[in-house]
Amino acid sequence: MIWVAVIITMLLFILVAKPTGVYLEKAFQGSKTLDKVFGPFEKLIFKITGVKEYNQTWKQYALSLVLLNGFMIVVVYFIFRLQGVLPLNPAHIEGMEPTLAFNTAISFMADTNLQHYSGENGLSYLSQLIGITFLMFAAPATTLALVMAFIRGLAGKELGNFFVDFTRALTRVFLPIAFIAALVFVALGVPQTLDGAVTAQTIDGAKQSILRGPVASFVSIKELGNNGGGFFGANSTHPFENPGQMSNILQMMLMMLLPTALPFTYGRMVGNKKQGRILFVSLFMVFLLGFITITTSELNGNPALNGMGIEHVQGSAEGKEVRFGTVFSSLYATVTTAAETGAVNTMHDTLTPIGGLVPLVNMMLNTVYGGVGAGFVNIIMYAIIAVFISGLMVGRTPEFLGKKIEGKEMKLIAVTILFHPLLILGFSALALSTNLGTDAISHSGFHGLTQVVYEYTSSAANNGSGFEGLGDNTPFWNITTGLVMFLGRYFSLITMLAVAASLKEKTVVPETVGTFRTDNSLFGGIFIGTIVIVGALTFFPMLVLGPIAEFLTLK
């Protein structure tokens, strides 16, 4: 029965992807999508803010994005620092320590949601609502806006206006869908209140304080925007965030909704729907491979316990919630790292070595399917690399969407693809070379190495999940992961927008019999191979020293 539920969940992922992709294309291309509802609201926002609907250059678009995001980071930083004297603080929580406030503000603006604090004890209701939830809408709206400009550039059209795209992302995508999802979560038992904690009497007569809050509205945008941060420290393992299997499936659907839709949006916007379909199918195959690998490993259990003759029919149950089980915990771990969300319904630090390898690889590749917007930019980056390599092998000038791929584009892509592993491996080496980093490690040996690399991988990929055995709430970890999150977020977005702008200016080369097609299964295979090979060449030595070595040791 459990496998039937898994298959149905997978089918739901597939069934909602195309309609959502069609809706996104219409919403951002000026087609009518509930204009009577959203149009007046958007015009009012433009009038109040003074936004004018004109086309920007790629530099203007990128500058608008960075300045708006930077302003939001500063505002939210001071909210966190001053929450102790601000209203909506029934628990009388004090202001955040400076480096933690720095880390948290960047974390949520970068759509990472890395949390070095426990949500219910670290933030007031004002900080949760005005600080965290606000950024949970703003962060994915930023990248969804940018990816639309990116696709327009690839299609040879004007990039558009960042502020217009940002507003449409909020009004036509995130606000309505998150509102409906929040109502469903309330119906499923997720609390939504501004009241403080309640005191309950336990069976043995003791008193217990039960924390609550505006959780349903928080969880809906947490998953839809691929944010992932928890209202509670336990994240989606907490019964108030994720009461049962229905809420669990809904959370996974929200996580996958926009990342899986964007390939179809792309296909429609560039005028070749097959392009989108082949990307969707190729990435879904990689996703399935990851799910099968982690599930098999977790169902086989811990090799160390197997050697003791201990039977565990449910597989490796450590760190998992009984109400979800091993299979759905494995699926959730695959989804949350494939969609770069970072929400967890099981503790990733307790996964088996190979089970923990899958989330790590998903984040290192950062492209299966990746988070809202940013992930799709990485997908196209790998697609262009695949075209470039194929062109070199047959002695032709590489072409993508009828545009020649030349030195300028490849230099930008080369720098971008190297920057991701440089952040991860460089900062991991720094942490491992100083007591400021190693003092936080709770496990020695191979697993300790994986803890460190996982933290920086999660930060660079804007995922936010963690091996929570790492004691990371220190100035060193707060500052270094904050820098990694900021650089990992904005560097690739800006460089790839420059690539799209460069391709926009090029004339379309007529298609001939020798043109390498990018809308068939051959390209799909080369595309997958490029992702795997580039990822393996970059990160394989670290994976051997970490999870693979741990697995072989336990065996």
Swiss-Prot record:
MF term (GO), any: potassium ion binding
First-listed, main subcellular location of the protein, grouped into a coarse class: membrane
Topological category with respect to the lipid bilayer: Multi-pass membrane protein
Compartments reported by the entry: Cell membrane
Cell wall biogenesis/degradation among keywords: no
Keyword Cell membrane: yes
Any Pfam family matching the protein: KdpA
Disulfide bonds: none
Function: Part of the high-affinity ATP-driven potassium transport (or Kdp) system, which catalyzes the hydrolysis of ATP coupled with the electrogenic transport of potassium into the cytoplasm. This subunit binds the extracellular potassium ions and delivers the ions to the membrane domain of KdpB through an intramembrane tunnel.
Family stated for the protein in its record: Belongs to the KdpA family.
Oligomeric form and interacting partners: The system is composed of three essential subunits: KdpA, KdpB and KdpC.
Name used for this protein in its record: Potassium-transporting ATPase potassium-binding subunit
Organism: Bacillus cereus (strain B4264)
Lineage: Bacteria, Bacillati, Bacillota, Bacilli, Bacillales
